[in-house]
């Protein structure tokens, strides 16, 4: 028994609109397949092969055996036929093939000036314009709003190319202005990579507009603006695009909690940061705000190294640690982009790679900045320890157990690398004054490193190598001054380094002379025979330095005596130390005989003896 099965009509499900990055697709194909070297023939051959490959994938091949009707714009039937985005790609590649053929013929026409080639060129430009218009109409039926707007700008661009070949400059100016206006509006809405792509396209429109205005200078009522009707149509399309994007954002926000993405401005470009990196950057910024006041504002100024300086090193280490986490994320993203570009490079992916590199430069600059400040403080402390000054040794002992000049060489080498990366990643590359200070500071850091190496060589008694290194440091100091830097701190450090080198050179000269005399016996004998005069011993050599001040004698190199102890006894005319005690023990001759002799003589006459009276 037959039963009638009633089939209910299917509900109309809204068909998903196709999306095609027209400008990115065309620009990528042009750069990869010939147009980087202006080889239009190679690009045309690529377009033909790509169209054939797409048709074979869609099983829409045209040939003698199987005849397939071409797609005709007929409303609903067209929507049923176009059930894949590859149909839009075929239409775009047909436009690109006709345009590349026309550009190849244009180059031949400019050389030969053959009218037949010029006629063929106009036909090809006309076909490219018709195919771009067909692409625009197809996008209206089956593509999303973003693709429709891009197709409109692309169609206007091809129409302006056709009008230029026909020397219809007024029509060409109108079409190129429409294309420029659309790309300007799209650059305001897209992300960084799309913005760069549209900006390049806008720059390409400028010479075309100037050429049209030059040829229309004698005509009246020529304006460089889009008509009001066209502008309203463009604005309506862009308003629809904004509404669609807002709907997508609202639908995603209902399911997931989204946070506002931050943008970083570096090297005159603004870059959006993804959520994963944004979290790490927020941690870094919060820690920086909390502890920035504890860091020294000027590392070159006098730092109190005697107090507890360990917390400052901990802050620097934490800042660098947070930036290393950010660096790891960006480097992973960059490696994936590079790997993708090796297989399938596009203009959009190249711009994304460039923006990722700029983002990496931003992170590397701040990381190297904090590393440079931290190492500068550590070098200052180590140098003060070697000079015998008091510092907070607890902070240094965490880094090294015992400070030596080799530690300063290692740190200064690291400082040169850090400052080189920091200067390469700096934001203001165009400022000549900053670039000049960077060059001077880098040469100064290399000079300081060489100075520490010279000190280590001097400690190893390699005096000739030390002198060679110090001569090179002096050459670098002259190069610092040739940069004409006006940074006072760099000039002060240069002068201080030069004074230290002069002191070191005088010590090395003396030590080198002593070493040569002690090692070379012939030279020592020759120098010992020289004498200008002075007090010498019986052997002809002075026994000590004090006794040979007026003579040139090298015997002190082996003896090294400042004064002879005990000294030789010599008669000295001086009062005895204990004269009174010595006087008590001295026996003098008796005076009794002299006393008796005086009593037996003539008696005295008295007061009146002068007149002869007794």
From Swiss-Prot:
GO cellular component: endoplasmic reticulum; nucleolus; signal recognition particle, endoplasmic reticulum targeting
Localization per Swiss-Prot or TrEMBL: Cytoplasm; Nucleus, Nucleolus; Endoplasmic reticulum
Transmembrane segments: none
Main location: cytoplasm
Subunit structure as annotated in this protein's UniProt entry: Heterodimer with srp72. Srp68-srp72 heterodimer formation is stabilized by the presence of 7SL RNA. Component of a signal recognition particle (SRP) complex that consists of a 7SL RNA molecule and six protein subunits: srp72, srp68, srp54, srp19, srp14 and srp9. Within the SRP complex, interacts (via C-terminus) with srp72 (via N-terminus).
Family in the record: Belongs to the SRP68 family.
Function statement: Component of the signal recognition particle (SRP) complex, a ribonucleoprotein complex that mediates the cotranslational targeting of secretory and membrane proteins to the endoplasmic reticulum (ER). The SRP complex interacts with the signal sequence in nascent secretory and membrane proteins and directs them to the membrane of the ER. The SRP complex targets the ribosome-nascent chain complex to the SRP receptor (SR), which is anchored in the ER, where SR compaction and GTPase rearrangement drive cotranslational protein translocation into the ER.
Protein name: Signal recognition particle subunit SRP68
UniProt source species: Dictyostelium discoideum (Social amoeba)
